[in-house]
Design a protein with these regions (language model features):
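Short gly/pro-enriched beta-turn/loop segments at secondary-structure junctions
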Residues: 26, 82-87, 131-133
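Conserved functional hotspot residues or short segments at active or partner-binding sites
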Residues: 93-197
Length: 203
């Protein structure tokens, strides 16, 4: 889906991406990069001292930005990712989900840096507006340990395991990876094994 064959979470600055594309694609632009003072690659945004500016109306804090690559990947399906609530991308739900059941299932997966709790909510906009949704809320317990894309994969696999075709798995193919990923979810392959296959392709 992206404009270049790079990992979703590439950890490169805009200047590094510009240099990469300029070289790899033979663009030949006369780039001038102004280096930032005091910048450290390992620093989180809230450690920079800069004021947070919402990159999107539905991404209002750092936890939402951290969870977005995984939770946003399953947004195209028939569930709410919390748009129309105060905490988009920190929760998911649908009228057909059993929140306590899904929370138990996800917590048994021992997801790095995340704990999952059941909740109910009614979105004021977007999917399921005004409907009561059962679902789960993601609490970030260790942001350095969170693997957001794997989280999205684990959530998709758990939804398919628990609810089968009630969950529109086909709708997430474009954002979750590939048809092969969906086939492996349907076959019951462990999500960590599927994600390991992605890592092999990054080299």
């Amino acid at each position: 889906m992206g404009g270049a064959p790079i990992p979703l979470l590439h950890a490169m600055t805009v200047a590094e991406l510009a240099r990469l594309f300029n070289t790899e694609r033979g663009i030949g632009a006369d780039l001038e990069v102004v280096a930032m003072r005091g910048w450290r690659r390992e620093a989180w945004f809230d450690q920079t001292g800069l004021r947070w500016v919402d990159p999107s109306p539905n991404m209002r804090n750092l936890h939402q930005a951290l969870l977005y690559p995984g939770i946003g990947a399953i947004e195209g399906s028939n569930l709410s990712v919390g748009r129309g609530t105060d905490t988009p991308f920190e929760q998911i739900g649908a009228p057909w989900i059993d929140g306590p059941e899904l929370a138990r299932e996800l917590n048994t997966r021992r997801l790095p840096g995340v704990r999952v709790y059941p909740l109910r909510f009614s979105p004021t906009s977007s999917r399921f507006v005004g409907e009561l949704c059962d679902g789960v809320f993601f609490i970030v317990t260790d942001r350095d340990a969170v693997r957001p894309v794997r989280l999205g994969l684990e959530v998709a696999a758990a939804l398919y395991r628990l609810y089968g075709d009630q969950f529109d798995l086909d709708a997430v193919a474009r954002l979750l990876g590939s048809r092969d990923t969906l086939a492996r979810i349907r076959a019951g392959d462990p999500p960590w094994e599927i994600a390991a296959g992605w890592a092999e392709g990054e080299a």
